[in-house]
Amino acid sequence: HILIGEGKCHSDHADFWVGYDATLKSSPILVYGIFIFGLFLTGILLHSHQHQGSASFGMSVFNLGNAIMGSGILGLSYAMANTGIALFVILLVAVSIFSLYSVHLLLKTANEGGSLVYEQLGYKAFGMPGKLAASISITMQNIGAMSSYLFIVKYELPIVIQAFMGANNGEWYMNGDYLVILVSIVIILPLSLLKNLGYLGYTSGFSLLCMVFFLIVVIYKKFQIPCPYTVMLLNETVSKIQNISSGSINTTAVDYNEDVCTPKYFVFNSQTVYAVPILTFAFVCHPAILPMYEELKDRSRRKMQGVANVSFLAMFIMYLLAALFGYLTFNVHVEPELLHTYSKVFKADVVLLIVRLAVLTAVTLTVPVVLFPIRTSVNQLLCASKDFSWIRHTIITIGLLASTNLLVIFVPTIRDIFGFIGASAAAMLIFILPSAFYIKLVKKEPMKSVQKIGVMSFPSPFGSIPLICLWVLRCLLCQA
């Protein structure tokens, strides 16, 4: 991470921060406003979801957008910084088209296979191994999503506390690891212990609106932050000198002789391999496709495909704008979690503080929602024939939350979560399993048909993603 100097900054930046420190004194009113705004939107969403099984086209588009959108949007600028604008756009188009095509395969397979449950399609196609493959992939994806949400708490909550409390002198409540544990015990665990989701099931709508607000702020800040970033360059230069003096030279460090404010169109380095897994993680929504198909009013495969087309197009535009403006703002200095990068320029910014509070509220309330299906899967796998038990319910919940906390504490960055889950579980759910189900269950098309030959080659490049990541990791370890 790039550290900010203690009080010795460029005079323009200092004046700017002083102005924001003065404005920050009135921020509690704005903070209160954002929470009231969130509650109001949650009420609207509750009212909109009262009649299940009769979802309109527009509401289905909104629901699918909720399923697609997540923390993955925060890592897209980092992916663009390590691929370049042109290569990123090519990869984004490819992953979005392949993801949309796999939705087509999934809908067609569901009609032929006679089931609207992802795991049940796996069982009908390959028996218990197919069901286990689907269940494990969904569980891994949800654990990855939970971990990414808690990573956001780890990154952003100390910045919010510092904005209200003042300078960071090493207090325990400024440590992200302690804060993740505290938030998990005080807020997430009690909500996760609820037997039914209730109103928590609709916080995904609030989460989507928070991300839209975040995108607007990213675009706005692009025209407010100058380049070069004096504080960033100063601290990275000091860090580089310290590395050289200690004998450890970072071969991937930025060349400070080049123009760091000029965007690149093609970039190839050791981090480029993370781009496709990050994009895959950002587009995974396929386990939610079939339940939404079941709830669609006057449902047909063509109508649901139209819902998917509109949702994917909207998310494609949002992802492209967030990645592009985040990259153009920070260029090579962008971090794996975009929102955290702004703390390197702004010590106290009211708008960014509201964004952080909104995102923190959304992800904290979303963790119990994501944990719910994981706990259900574990219960079905281990104790399907047993009656409900509060003791078992509590033990499974605490175990899942504790393991996720350990991941967040010991995994170095959110980039590793995006990369690993995107290369494994997300790739399985988007590319490999829908193709395998289609080949096995759709009988009316022969194996030598153009459709099935194309589908058989469809997952092959993405199935090798974990091997590529392991190969790169081994190379880096060998160099070390």
Sequence positions of predicted segments:
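Membrane-embedded helix-loop-helix hairpins and adjacent transmembrane boundary segments
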Residues: 407-415, 419-421
